Amino acid sequence: MSHANTPRDWVLRAPQHGAVERIEAYFAGHGYDPHRHDTYAIGQTLAGVQSFRYRRSQRHSLPGGCLVLHPDELHDGEAGSQEGFRYRMLYVEPALIQQALGGRPLPFVRGGLSDDPRLIAASRALLQAMDTPLEPL
């Protein structure tokens, strides 16, 4: 695992497992500029408030919920409170999700935030131990 060596902000990367990447990060203020991913970004805010622009609206992720950012959707990120924010994120190729769904259509989470208990439990299991290799989906 690598850990960014900065005074306050850091990013921890879990060992790569095929088409899945996992990170845990902390940002005290500005997190990242607007960008896109080719993958689904599925995660959870662990502490603080994670604020981000997504689909032309300002969003705020709190501990206990689930973030699902769809491929090729522009988003940014910053702390929504003075304490900063810590989160874990899983980046998954769309084909892998479709395979896990048995070919059913890919899911869509409007607005990027979900309080669905099934999704929260599933993402928590995948994000739990950053130093543990993932099991196949």
Stretch-by-stretch model annotation:
Residues 7-108:
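N-terminal regulatory/effector-sensing and dimerization cores
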